[in-house]
Amino acid sequence: MTAETLRPPPPAPAPATPGPRRRRRQPWRRALRRDWQLYSLAVLPLLFFLVFRYLPMIGNVIAFRRFSPGGSVFGEYWVGLRYFRLFLADPTFWQVFTNTLVLGTLTLLFCFPLPIVLALLLNEVRARRLKRFVQSVSYLPHFLSIVIVAAMVMQLLSMDGSVNQVVRGIGGEAVPFLQQPGWFRAIYVSSEVWQTVGWGTILYLAALTTIDENLYEAARIDGANRWRQTWHVTLPGIRPTMVTLLILNIGTFMAVGFEKILLLYNPLTYPTADVISTYLFRLGFESSNFSYAAAIGLFEAVIGLILVLGANTISRRTVGTSLW
């Protein structure tokens, strides 16, 4: 047995004493320090939403309290679900609720797909001047005030308007379009399409520019025609934009177009034109029934929230794209 085998093993090194822990900065703090100038631009919009959108939500408490003008801001005494039971038993509410669903559905069916179709058609146009002209003509109505658009519609469809002049010219009789309930939905949806389709087209044209041209080249090599390229390359390429805009449109489904409807409708067209927002306006500002109007408005907001959450969940599970 040698001396090396009898030598004891060397002592283990002493564990290093841990130094003072260095606090790791949070990623959002680091980003805030680096890009504070950009984040500062969001201060005013956030204040706007806080002051004019979120703080007024506190006033929804009057849906559960008896409110009288000149009294307490939060109502005089608690009434619970009394106003909710009242409007659920009111046949007028269900009429305006049905009108809201019908107008919202028609608006979504026409105003959502038409910008996609127009963007796909313009994407195939190779003449730049023609393309720019069509783009300008289509999206300029978006910048017109709703008051101006409503005035144009009333001028065109009046008894002495251009449309009735054409009707008389072909041997027909003048039609009181704005006084007949059966015409209101077509008038509203067509004016909404004319005013909004161009702006949506610009968004989809911007999304089309992000599609890799190599995908089209590979599709052509595989023998795909223009229709198959559109179906298998173009539409999947703009799917995130389509889903985002669809969810945003569903978010405004219950609101429909309060200003335009308020300007175009009249008591003769109430059976098809009166929606929840205009009904609330009459209840709150003409009848001074603020608690009843607040209850209906809260119900409308809850339905809209459910629609947005449902659309986002379905989109995430079916196509894998969602807002959050």
Predicted regions and their residues:
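Short, intrinsically disordered terminal tails adjacent to the first/last structured region
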Residues: 1-22
